[in-house]
């Protein structure tokens, strides 16, 4: 549920599509606020949000199946614009008196749309009589239209590829405008929200900042607030927003578990204390964490140990402050979107994300989540709005367990220091080559393998370092970065020459899938 209220909202009803979040991203990129809700709770959300327009998502289901998801009748009774995408088009037709059938020629992948009529939906992008690339993914198709609808676009296997009831402002598209494979899709969605729904592009990070600050003040009142600062972008932006809202009522706690990148803890402390005058406590708990991890090779046990110790240390520090009433977390919108479950009946699974585990319950604190309505790219824009430097905002993702999961096998302080130095050199080489912003994530891994080498006149038996770099849009899928071999040669030479304990460097050329980005 929203922590703030937006009068000009688009409601996206999720029927279980894998790309529903992309619809929301495109609407947000048009500077319009939107929310995703599962079809099971769409009635309640429609009443609560009173949206200006509705978008119906795709679905893995068939409208011809008994009990298949439906849109609430209330949206068709409200007299507001509706856009149905793929399954959304089909269920809208079926619910309004048209017909949908299964078993016709399927369309998966690239297709070409022939524009039959001009429409506000196509304004500025497609004209009558032209042909355009779109992305299809459907097995069912509309075979007859409800009263009031006309065909405004066709494809070879979808005669009702785009339909419209211009009077009621109901539109249906059989293709997916939200994916990048429909080149003009983002503009089509902009046409729907701006021209057809009539919402002005007022959703900006400047406006969000003002509303979020006001919402935090209203929630917190005169209470005491603490924030677990990790050094990452999300927690940092959340902390700055909270500080702008409540000032000295906020104290940030940064737990240095000894698993951060080179000089990272000190850099974060300097930035927040000196540049932002933020009350910040740095806790050096590295001995405690590394001692508990010593020799542990199971990646899941590493994660659980780190999570448990973090809660213990944070709890101890919070008690030293006399406790707190509120805990700030950098939870993002994808973490809290309700996901649709078709296999478990009508139940809805809530994806939750807590940066600090069970702390709120254990310490009887209320959560303050000022970023829970934002996607990651919006958080970066908000960080810029708050004055965070580009060098910080654009940093590569870093896992919560830190270097512990980039050190397969047993963790020791010595191995962590070797890895930290190698990682710093690798990232330095990437920056010097001007490649940092072209790569989604890059890091070094210290393998639990030693190999024979020759350095000078002597024989060595030292660790192998693996280098990893991937390109990605969202981290869900990734391809390895295709370096020039000269770059890899230079990086490997520097690491071997400057880091005692490594005598061999390899490069990981695994994509995701089948591999994951991190090694553990």
Swiss-Prot record:
Residues annotated as transmembrane: none
Residue stretches making up the Glutamine amidotransferase type-1 domain: 9-202
Top enzyme class: ligase
Active site positions, chain numbering: 86 (nucleophile), 176, 178
Pathway given in the UniProt record: Purine metabolism; GMP biosynthesis; GMP from XMP (L-Gln route): step 1/1
Keywords noted in UniProt: ATP-binding, Glutamine amidotransferase, GMP biosynthesis, Ligase, Nucleotide-binding, Purine biosynthesis
InterPro entries xref list: Class_I_gatase-like, GATASE, GMP_synth_C, GMP_synth_GATase, GMP_synthase, GMPS_ATP_PPase_dom, NAD/GMP_synthase, Rossmann-like_a/b/a_fold
Reaction equations catalysed: XMP + L-glutamine + ATP + H2O = GMP + L-glutamate + AMP + diphosphate + 2 H(+)
Sections of the chain in a coiled coil: none
Its EC number(s): 6.3.5.2
Any Pfam family hit: GMP_synt_C
Binding residues annotated for ATP, in chain numbering: 230-236
GO MF terms held by the record: ATP binding; GMP synthase activity
Domain (GMPS ATP-PPase) ranges: 203-395
GO cellular component term of the entry, any: cytosol
HAMAP family, per database record: GMP_synthase (MF_00344)
Entry function: Catalyzes the synthesis of GMP from XMP.
Quaternary structure annotation from Swiss-Prot or TrEMBL: Homodimer.
Stated name of the protein: GMP synthase [glutamine-hydrolyzing]
Protein species of origin: Brucella canis (strain ATCC 23365 / NCTC 10854 / RM-666)
Gene: guaA
């Amino acid at each position: 549920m929203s922590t703030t209220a937006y009068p000009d909202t688009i409601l996206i009803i999720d029927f279980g599509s894998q790309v529903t979040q992309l619809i929301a991203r495109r609407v947000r990129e048009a500077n319009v606020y939107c929310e995703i809700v599962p079809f099971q709770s769409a009635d309640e959300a429609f009443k609560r949000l009173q949206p200006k327009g509705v978008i119906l998502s795709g679905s893995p289901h068939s409208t011809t199946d008994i009990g298949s998801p439906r849109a609430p009748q209330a949206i068709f009774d409200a007299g507001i614009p509706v856009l149905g995408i793929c399954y959304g088009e089909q269920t809208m037709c079926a619910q309004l008196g048209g017909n949908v059938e299964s078993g016709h020629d399927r369309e998966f992948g690239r297709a070409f749309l022939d524009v039959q009529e001009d429409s506000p939906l196509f304004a500025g992008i497609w004209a009558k009589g032209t042909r355009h690339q779109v992305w299809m993914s459907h097995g069912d198709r509309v075979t007859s239209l409800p009263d009031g609808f006309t065909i405004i676009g066709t494809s070879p296997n979808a005669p009702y590829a785009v339909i419209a009831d211009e009077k009621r402002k109901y539109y249906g598209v059989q293709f997916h405008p939200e994916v990048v494979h429909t080149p003009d899709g983002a503009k089509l969605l902009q046409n729907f929200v701006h021209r057809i729904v009539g919402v002005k592009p007022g959703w900006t990070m400047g406006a969000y900042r003002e509303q979020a600050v006001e919402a935090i003040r209203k929630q917190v009142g005169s209470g005491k607030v603490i924030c677990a600062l990790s050094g990452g972008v999300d927690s940092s932006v959340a902390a700055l927003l909270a500080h702008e809202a409540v000032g000295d009522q906020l104290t940030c706690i940064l737990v240095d578990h000894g698993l951060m990148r080179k000089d990272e803890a000190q850099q974060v402390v300097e930035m927040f204390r000196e540049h932002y005058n933020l009350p910040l406590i740095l806790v050096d708990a590295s001995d405690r964490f590394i001692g508990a991890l010593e020799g542990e090779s199971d990646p899941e046990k590493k994660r659980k140990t780190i999570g448990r110790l973090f809660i213990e240390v944070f709890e101890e520090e919070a008690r030293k402050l006399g406790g707190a009433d509120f805990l700030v977390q950098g939870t993002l919108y994808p973490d809290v979107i309700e996901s649709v479950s078709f296999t478990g009946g009508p139940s809805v699974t809530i994806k939750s994300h807590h940066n600090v585990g069970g702390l709120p319950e254990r310490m009887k604190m209320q959560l303050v989540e000022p970023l829970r309505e934002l996607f990651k790219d919006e958080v970066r824009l908000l960080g810029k709005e708050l004055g965070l430097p580009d060098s910080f905002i654009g940093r590569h993702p870093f896992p919560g367990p830190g270097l512990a999961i980039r050190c397969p096998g047993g963790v020791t302080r010595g191995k962590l220091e070797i890895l930290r130095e190698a990682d710093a050199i690798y990232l330095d080489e990437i920056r010097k080559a001007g490649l940092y912003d072209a790569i989604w994530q890059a890091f070094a891994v210290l393998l639990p393998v030693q190999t024979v080498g020759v350095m000078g006149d002597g024989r060595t038996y030292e660790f192998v370092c693996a280098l990893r770099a991937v390109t990605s849009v969202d981290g869900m899928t990734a391809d390895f970065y295709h370096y020039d071999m000269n770059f890899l040669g230079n990086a490997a030479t520097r690491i071997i020459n400057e880091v005692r304990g490594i005598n061999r460097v390899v490069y990981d050329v695994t994509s995701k899938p089948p591999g994951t980005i991190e090694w553990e």
